[in-house]
């Protein structure tokens, strides 16, 4: 089947749009960077699905970050995605977390932050409390309050054919459409019947036909979704020289090198004293170049 793909579709006679995302490798890359507890893996999968679905609603080049913050065992869980559906994510937690821990058991008292950053134009940030039993309900509340467009989400994570999968669907009323509330309710009822194994295992066209074969559905060209971190040795070197020089050389004197670790992909970049000196020489306008 086609996985790591987002499909957009339109109910031509009902003034409702939809999205379907099916992920395996992109999800697996994110949860393999650390030894995340099972419940945190699930939460990251839900955030990943949510971010890809919301990013697909962008009508411009830019990115969306969906972030959970709280005072519970999980202090942070965040996924970032852009208009090219390049995604990355990370979570921070302390202590033991039960496999079946709920959103509120993990996050405690917290909130959801959605940040939209166009390449051109103003940055937008929305903050909502964790009102709801799960992430799906929190996001639907966000849509109700901010977009004021009737929106429903279905988000699933789990094992399929021995590997972690994450998938989801979104349906949303088209502004100024000619459809009736009954149309949306009709599609809600149909989508409520979707099973995990269908989301994880069926091709998009087969799944959409299974759900909506009585309706006229136009499916657009699929868009691939891929893990992309964006870290590099060059960026790590640039970060080092923003730190007080004396502090960096104290570290070098103590351990012989300076290392930066990327939380998103798990890569560690290590610089010895010669390389650090070259970084500072380059930054001060010297002729030496770091390779």
Swiss-Prot record:
Spell out the Pfam families in the cross-references. Answer: HSP33
User: Which modifications occur after translation, per UniProt?
Assistant: Under oxidizing conditions two disulfide bonds are formed involving the reactive cysteines. Under reducing conditions zinc is bound to the reactive cysteines and the protein is inactive.
- The gene for this chain is hslO
Q: What is its main location?
A: cytoplasm
Cysteine disulfide partners in this protein: 229-231, 262-265
Cross-referenced CDD domains: Hsp33 (cd00498)
The UniProt entry, under SUPFAM superfamilies, shows:
Hsp33 domain, HSP33 redox switch-like
Q: Where is the signal peptide?
A: none
Q: Its family?
A: Belongs to the HSP33 family.
Task performed by this protein? Redox regulated molecular chaperone. Protects both thermally unfolding and oxidatively damaged proteins from irreversible aggregation. Plays an important role in the bacterial defense system toward oxidative stress.
HAMAP family on file: HslO
- Which Gene Ontology BP annotations are present? protein refolding
Protein name listed in UniProt: 33 kDa chaperonin
Which keywords describe this protein according to UniProt? Answer: Chaperone, Cytoplasm, Disulfide bond, Redox-active center, Zinc
- Molecular functions per Gene Ontology: protein folding chaperone; unfolded protein binding
ATP-binding recorded as keyword: no
Q: Does the keyword Chaperone apply?
A: yes
Where in or outside the cell it occurs: the entry states: Cytoplasm
GO cellular component terms, A-Z: cytoplasm
